[in-house]
């Protein structure tokens, strides 16, 4: 029996803005209305990041839209901080890397794995402007090469 994975949201902008060094799979502590909205695909990871406070990992600035068919008084705050579920050793390892090397934790994708919502967290270093330009140029050159090969 393999793991059934369904990607619900992907942060493509993160791969452009950051150089991803390592990835971690984390669970999330969510409310019921948040799970319903996530399953409906109403989530935006673009501005999200993770922080470690008091030995706990927190996902911040990720927008999960309120569920439509739920009474507004029972709905959740779209931008609330959400706790990430990681092992203590992983958190300790991340603290050292984030504080000493000046790296950032960025959510890369949100997915369902065996019915549970997981987030793929990337340990990332910010790219400089010339690195971004170089990536764009390489992508454009690759596209042109493929186009030329197709015309033959």
Swiss-Prot record:
One of its GO terms (molecular function) is RNA binding. Pfam families: SmpB. Residues 132-152 have a biased composition (Basic and acidic residues). Keywords: Cytoplasm, RNA-binding. It is found in: Cytoplasm. Residues 130-152 are annotated as: Disordered. Belongs to the SmpB family. Required for rescue of stalled ribosomes mediated by trans-translation. Binds to transfer-messenger RNA (tmRNA), required for stable association of tmRNA with ribosomes. tmRNA and SmpB together mimic tRNA shape, replacing the anticodon stem-loop with SmpB. tmRNA is encoded by the ssrA gene; the 2 termini fold to resemble tRNA(Ala) and it encodes a 'tag peptide', a short internal open reading frame. During trans-translation Ala-aminoacylated tmRNA acts like a tRNA, entering the A-site of stalled ribosomes, displacing the stalled mRNA. This is SsrA-binding protein. It comes from Thermosynechococcus vestitus (strain NIES-2133 / IAM M-273 / BP-1). The gene is smpB.
């Amino acid at each position: 029996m393999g793991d059934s994975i369904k990607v619900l949201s992907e942060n493509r902008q993160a791969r452009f803005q950051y150089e991803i060094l390592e990835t971690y799979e984390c669970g999330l502590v969510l409310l019921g209305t948040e799970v319903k909205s996530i399953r409906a695909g109403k989530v935006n990871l673009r501005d999200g990041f993770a922080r470690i406070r008091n030995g706990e990992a927190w996902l911040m600035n990720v927008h999960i839209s309120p569920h439509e068919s739920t009474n507004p008084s029972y709905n959740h705050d779209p931008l609330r901080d959400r706790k990430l579920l990681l092992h203590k050793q992983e958190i300790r390892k991340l603290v050292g890397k984030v504080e000493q090397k000046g790296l950032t934790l960025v959510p890369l994708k949100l997915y369902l794995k065996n019915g549970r919502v997981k987030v793929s967290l990337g340990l990332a270093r910010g790219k400089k402007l010339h690195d971004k330009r170089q990536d764009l140029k390489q992508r454009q050159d690759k596209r042109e090469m493929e186009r030329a090969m197709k015309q033959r």
